[in-house]
């Protein structure tokens, strides 16, 4: 009988953390062993299962990842860039692999993550949903066929508490398109604003961003020509699809030694 992969979760009390824990508990191949919060958090020492409403599971909330180094195989992190980089230091020190779902990294921070991948195995993805990763492939193919004849726009919608914009997923969609078109996403993007904007530049990707209510996540890519329009849309109805993909990634990366991976590697796309 195969041993279960022991997983540590950072930010276990947040929306994503709760979903991850519930999915781990439902997965026969994984086992939650560590739940890490910020220093001096008021819930330290409490059973995380009781806190998130699934009953006691024997995992106490801690702010000391270093003393838990022998208790987990893979860390899953959906926090913020500064926190992720700190957890990466721990993982590198203790030779633990990590799954990163945090978004909003700067180029310099991405370079730091890449440097750590020479010593440990890292999966980083803007979106762990299987559906959104299939969307990336559809967008790539569509861009190859009609990209040069279309105005391309990305519309993304998220809940009012999301702190980064555009979303990491929207930016990744932009990168997929830019690679096919041989564009530079940083230079060849339009972020719509009021006023006289002039005629739309055909060789740019337009971004429209909505933050409202409790929208989990919706991304639409529009390919518009003079004669027709194609829309490709992915809508997440809840966060469980993200959690399942992250757990699948943790199981996949458990036995890897080093390297930087994403969901296309996990899904063999």
From Swiss-Prot:
Indicate which residues the UniProt annotation says bind NAD(+).
Answer: 11-16, 101-103, 125-128
One Gene Ontology cellular component term attached to this UniProt record is:
cytosol
Alphabetical keyword list: Amino-acid biosynthesis, Cytoplasm, Diaminopimelate biosynthesis, Lysine biosynthesis, NAD, NADP, Oxidoreductase
Which residues does the record give as (S)-2,3,4,5-tetrahydrodipicolinate binding sites? Answer: 159, 168-169
Record's InterPro entries?
DapB_C, DapB_N, DapB_N_CS, DHDPR_bac, NAD(P)-bd_dom_sf
PROSITE patterns (UniProt xref): DAPB
Decide whether keyword Zinc-finger is in the record.
Answer: no
Q: Give one GO term, molecular function aspect.
A: oxidoreductase activity, acting on CH or CH2 groups, NAD or NADP as acceptor
Tell me, what does this protein do in biology?
Catalyzes the conversion of 4-hydroxy-tetrahydrodipicolinate (HTPA) to tetrahydrodipicolinate.
Q: Which family does it belong to?
A: Belongs to the DapB family.
Q: What is this protein called?
A: 4-hydroxy-tetrahydrodipicolinate reductase
Species assigned in the record: Buchnera aphidicola subsp. Acyrthosiphon pisum (strain Tuc7)
Q: Which gene encodes it?
A: dapB
